Amino acid sequence: FIGPIISALASLFG
C-alpha cells in the first residue's frame, strides 16, 4: 500500500 502515512509515521519514529 502506498500512502503519505508512512512518511508521517517515520517522522514519529524518528
UniProtKB/Swiss-Prot annotation:
GO terms (BP aspect): defense response to bacterium
Summary of the tissues where the protein is detected: Expressed by the skin glands.
Superkingdom per UniProt: Eukaryota
Subcellular localization(s) per the UniProt record: Secreted
Cleavable signal peptide: none
Keywords: Amidation, Amphibian defense peptide, Antibiotic, Antimicrobial, Secreted
GO cellular component: extracellular region
Post-translational modification Glycine amide, affected residues: 14
Summary of the function given for this chain in its UniProt record: Antimicrobial peptide. Active against the Gram-positive bacterium S.aureus (MIC>60 uM) and the Gram-negative bacterium E.coli (MIC>60 uM).
Assigned protein family: Belongs to the frog skin active peptide (FSAP) family. Temporin subfamily.
Name of the molecule in the record: Temporin-1DYa
